[in-house]
Amino acid sequence: TFKIDTVTQENLDEKLSTYLSAGDLLLDLAWNIDANAIIGWAHDHGVIYLNTSVEEWEPYAAGATRNPTERTLYWRHMKLRKLTDTWGGKGPTAIVEHGANPGLVSHLTKKALFDIATSAIKDGKVSGIEQALSDENFPVLAQKLGVKVIHIAERDTQISDKPKQVNEFVNTWSVEGFYEEGIAPAEMGWGTHEKSLPVNAYQHADGPKNQICIAQPGATTWVRSWVPNMETTGMVIRHGEAFTISDHLTVWENGKAVYRPTVHYAYCPTDAAVASMHELQMRQWDLTENQRIMNEEIIDGDDRLGVLLMGHPYKSWWTGSLLNIHDSRKLVPKQSATTVQVASAVYAAVAWAMANPNSGYLVPDDLPWREVLGFAEKYWGGYHSAAADWDPLMHRNDLFKGWNNRKYDESDPWQFSNFLV
C-alpha cells in the first residue's frame, strides 16, 4: 500500500512515528529532508536507515551570500560526523549515500584497484604490492600503484522519440536533484600530487580537509574524461563519493596526508539533459515547472557508468556498467538503464543492511565491496573492467594553442588543470 504524505521540519517525529517502529527500515529517497534530523530520529527509535544523498531542509537559503564552503557536501558530512561520532559506532545500521553514484561506485573503485593490481603483478609491471593486495589495504595499494586521479565517469546516451520542448527540463532521473547539484559549487577530493589550486578554489578549515570547492556551478565546470570506448567532457557535479572515496584512500603519516588521489564526478548526461541545463543557465538558473523524466519513450542508448582510475602503470582503467536500454528492460520492464542501475544499487545496500541491522553509521566505503557488488551485478549487466590507453592531453585539439595563454603541464598529465575544458 502506497501512502502519499509530507514530512516537514515541524512534523517529522509525528509522521515517522506513525509509520515506523524499532526494527523497521526507513528508505529515504526524498530531497530536502535534513539528514541530521531524519538519521538522528532513526537512530533514537531503533530504525534501520538508508538514503542516497545527504540533504538539508533549505539548501538554497542565503543563496550567493553564503560562503561557498558552506554550500558543499563536505559541510554536510562534517555536520553528520558531529552527530554520529557520539554513537560510538553502535546502534541501528544507518547507511548514507548508497545509490549507484554515490554508492556502488565506491565498491567499483575497490574492484578496479584489485583488478589493476592483479594484472600488474601478472604482467610484471610492479613489485612490492602483494601484501597490500592480500590485505586489501586500498589506500596503500592505490599509493603504490601510483593512482593520481579517479573520475566517476558517466556518459548517458539514451534518446527518446519525444524531443525536448523549449522551456522543458528533461532528464533520466530527478530533475530537482540534478538542479540542486548542478547549481552548487563544483566540489572534488583534492589529490596530494596537485601543484596548484584552480581559480576561485576554496579549502576547508576543519575535518580531514580532503576536498576543495570552486566558486562556480558544477554544471558549468567541464573536464575531459573517458568511458568505453569514447572520450567525453563531463560536468564536475558535486557528489558524495568524491568525499568518501578520497577520504578512505588517504594515507596518513604523523597526522599529515601523504597520499590522496583527486576524485570527482565527470558527468555527461543525455543530450536532452545537456540542452536542458544549458537552457537553465539562459534562464538565469530559474528552474522551469515543465519537467519530464524520460522512461518509456526512450528508444535507444545506454548509460555507461563507472570509475576511471588514472596514473598507474596501465595509464587508465575503467570499471563499471555498460547497460543499455534494451537489456535494462529485459531485466526490469518499463525502466531505463539509469533507473535500473540506481534501484539495484539501493537494493544491494538494503539487502546488506537487513542482514546487518546493528552496524551503526556507515558510508558506502565501509561496506564489504564484493558482497554488495554481488547483489547488483545482474542488474548492471555485469561489470566491465579493463585498461584504457588515455590521458587528458592525448588527442587534445586546442584550436588557439599558443595564443590563448592556456598552459598545460606536459610533465604530469594528471594535473587537474590538464583536464579542464
Identify the meaning behind each predicted range:
Residues 21-22, 109:
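Alpha-helix C-terminal capping/helix-to-coil transition sites in glycosyltransferase folds
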Residues 22-23, 92:
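Local beta-strand N-terminus motif with an aromatic residue
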Residues 36-47, 52-90:
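Rossmann-fold NAD(P)-binding glycine/threonine-rich loop
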Residues 7-9, 27-35:
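N-terminal glycine-rich "phosphate-gripper" loop used for MgATP/nucleotide binding
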Residues 115-421:
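C-terminal catalytic/substrate-binding lobe primarily of soluble NAD(P)-dependent oxidoreductases
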Residues 98-107:
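Domain-scale recognition of functional cores that engage charged ligands
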